[in-house]
Amino acid sequence: MREFCTKWWKRIATVDMLFIGVLTLLASLFASWLKQFPGFSLFGALIIALLIGMIIQFPIRSAYVGSNDGRKAGVKDAAGLISNKLLRLGIILLGFKLNLAVLFTQGIKCLPIAAVVVTLTIIVCYAIARKLGVDPMLAILTAGGTGICGAAAVMGLAGSIKVPEDKQDEKDNDVTMAVAIVAIMGTVFALLEIALGPLTGMTKDQLGITAGASLHEIAHAVAGGDAFGAVDIATIMKLSRVLMLVFAAIIIAIWWEKKHSEVQSTGKKTVAFPWFMLGFIGASIIGTFVPFVTSITPQLVDFAYIVLGMAMAALGINVNFKAIASKGKKPMLASFLTSILLMCFAAGVAMLFF
């Protein structure tokens, strides 16, 4: 235990960790401030934080790292540690946003729809991506982000998948690429649904369900629902999909371990069970049924987004632009085609059941 603590203290207590920690915190806070303005609100704080991280990597390299190899390794390790560990903490804290009492009362019809939507979307998007030649990691992350809840889903699923140490950089690039793809697709389809919604003849509740069942980020679903005067039903539908992240993360972790894992096993076969998802459920239960916690839920959720924003900014700092440029077109096409099918399916379900 002492050796473990010493090892982690040496890794954390560095100038590079302090520098990157402060930068990612500032990036996250700035993103949270920016999201309140028109235009930025459609992207949400997490996507903005990722973009800030991608931008500031250039002055970090030129002004701070320079030709110092030790500093370069320190920055990379610090950003990697922040993106990995704060991701899990942020997902756990995000559980406070999920009010189970509301979901199992007002949203009782939304839960089975969410289960079907998430399952079909992940399967279809993954199949299309693989058919186009996308590697399994990027394909499943893009599928999960498209089907569940955008950036948070990509990061949640990434935390459930183990890769060898020498493949961690490639995995981080895939995470960044998948986040960027679902952010772009979510924005495009949010604008498309807002424009086409009034022309369909659907009721406002049907339009709200369609937005919640088909749009990628929570911010997209809220924007779509608000445009139709159905923000409450859109949010409930979207949060029903968010709940599916728990089951998707567990199932995908088991599937990945059996089909694609490259981690060397030492004896007994184990599965990379996403234990932090139990924390997510625990936070949901506490946030729903403990009165004191319920009263401070907005503050806890704000803190969750700050933590996740730090993780996203750290991802942006380590991103490899050449890798993204060479691999991004096919998964984006897969997400685009799936998003069209998802929008049509969600509209059909909304008209049938609401």
Curated annotation (Swiss-Prot):
Keywords: Cell membrane, Membrane, Transmembrane, Transmembrane helix. It is a multi-pass membrane protein. The chain crosses the membrane at residues 12-33, 43-65, 86-108, 112-129, 138-160, 175-197, 239-256, 271-293, 300-321, 331-353. Its main location: membrane. It holds the Pfam family Cons_hypoth698. InterPro entries: UPF0324_pro. GO terms for cellular component: plasma membrane. It is found in: Cell membrane. Belongs to the UPF0324 family. This is UPF0324 membrane protein BL1094. It comes from Bifidobacterium longum (strain NCC 2705). The lineage of its organism: Bacteria, Bacillati, Actinomycetota, Actinomycetes, Bifidobacteriales.
